[in-house]
């Protein structure tokens, strides 16, 4: 469960099924779904089956250490 200060992300799910945690709400996701994650939104994804998705990042700076980690319980 993480958030970014400087970047937005768009995830497009190509194959598989999973659960998306986005700002405390859980949603089933799968093939054909697209999710827009704005900077500051807490997010994580868990595969029910093997997941394949494309992530596109935008913002500045796009750096590896632009991540803040948070505790998350998938049973919430």
Each language-model region and where it sits:
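Short beta-strand His + acidic residue motifs that chelate non-heme Fe in jelly-roll/DSBH
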Residues: 1-2, 20-21, 37, 42-48, ...
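Short, conserved beta-strand element in jelly-roll/cupin
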Residues: 3-21, 59
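Short acidic-glycine-tyrosine-enriched beta hairpin
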Residues: 10, 24-42
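Beta-strand-connecting loop/turn residues
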Residues: 16, 25, 49-50
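Short hydrophobic/aromatic patches on the structural cores and recognition surfaces of FHA
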Residues: 16-18, 32, 53
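Double-stranded beta-helix
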Residues: 44, 48-76
């Amino acid at each position: 469960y993480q958030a970014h200060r400087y970047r937005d992300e768009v995830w497009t799910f190509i194959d598989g099924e999973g659960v998306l945690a986005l700002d405390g709400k859980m949603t089933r996701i799968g093939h054909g779904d697209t999710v827009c994650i704005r900077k500051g939104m807490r997010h994580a994804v868990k595969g029910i089956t093997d997941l394949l998705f494309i992530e596109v990042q935008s913002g500045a700076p796009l750096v590896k250490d632009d991540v803040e980690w948070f505790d998350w319980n998938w049973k919430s």
